[in-house]
Swiss-Prot record:
This is Uncharacterized protein YwbB. It holds the Pfam family DUF2711.
Amino acid sequence: MLDYIWLDDESPILQQVPVEYSSAALIFSPFIQMPEGWENAKRKNDYEHIYPNDNEIRGIGKAVSWKKVMSSCGFQTHAELALALMTSIGALRDEFAREDLAEVLHENINGDLYYPSEDHISNFHIPSLVKVLGANGSNRFYYAEPIVENRGVLDITEANLRTVLDEAATELVLTDEKMDFVFMSVYDSFINVFLAKDKNIHELVERMGWEAMICDESTYISWYR
């Protein structure tokens, strides 16, 4: 199976992955909209940090696109929203941080709307992951977590993917048993990296309903800078 790939910002993504993967895309994890009044019902005191757990997200959460949040904030690009998100969690060095964008984002995150899943693969992507991992006839998928040295193989079902995502640490890689497709979480970010052996993945990305940026030969993991 394929090990997790530690992508750096010294060279483009497609230069750092195994040569058999000719295509890559950055998949934006959706924001999470909970029902109106949900946070107030959960809150026990004014200082408590409230964020929905996996079961709550899957049960009553709704996916909200980056484009919708960009529109609310007046941002023109996905890069601006990425900078706002990463600045707000302290993931960027001072020279790259954009406190002005983070402030605008903060002002527009309200009404039981929450940040996307940080460091992890979004629960909202589980149904499409089942479709992609089984697209070429695979019945099982591999998973690996390099930090905790946990890996295994399971049947491709939503239940098994839920279990893996719920228990995963930060870095996680998923592949079908033929290793035609790869899905990786990225630490300190709100995106996932999708790799495919097929040269053209535009149609697949659109069919899965992913909000994404298709990588070209010059796309870096620090694409937002």
